[in-house]
């Protein structure tokens, strides 16, 4: 799955570069005052929030799964709002690579945009697994039942 996504990211970067006049301005770069370690952790937590949202809304079996795109889109939007000024918001290595290839600009810290999403996905998966082990659905269902009793 990685290879086609990387090819698509480079194709999208090339297409965006071809459609916009002048220099490519959509590459990921650390903002002024943002160190590599801060960038690493910001990207990691942004990716973790996105991945955790996907796990809780699309992977978990519920009646509301048909609406999973809404919270996923909102979490991606919030990640961009929070991180763009600091890191350019990579969140996806293929997107970061595509923009870097189109701009022919690979900063010495480009590795952040590859390592952070992997760490963030692992963090989100770990929290999700912990919730599975703790059987959080028991508490959610008990709270739903208590809420329905109040209404009756």
Swiss-Prot record:
Protein's recorded name: Putative uncharacterized protein SCY_3531
Subcellular location, record wording: Membrane
Topological region Cytoplasmic: 1-5, 60-65, 132-152
Transmembrane segments: 6-26, 39-59, 66-86, 111-131
Gene Ontology MF terms in the entry: water channel activity
Extracellular side: 27-38, 87-110
Motif NPA positions after renumbering to this chain: 92-94
Keyword Cell membrane: no
GO cellular component, one term: plasma membrane
Pfam families: MIP (PF00230)
Family: Belongs to the MIP/aquaporin (TC 1.A.8) family.
Keyword annotations from UniProtKB, A to Z: Membrane, Transmembrane, Transmembrane helix
The organism's place on the tree of life at top rank: Eukaryota
Membrane topology term: Multi-pass membrane protein
Main location: membrane
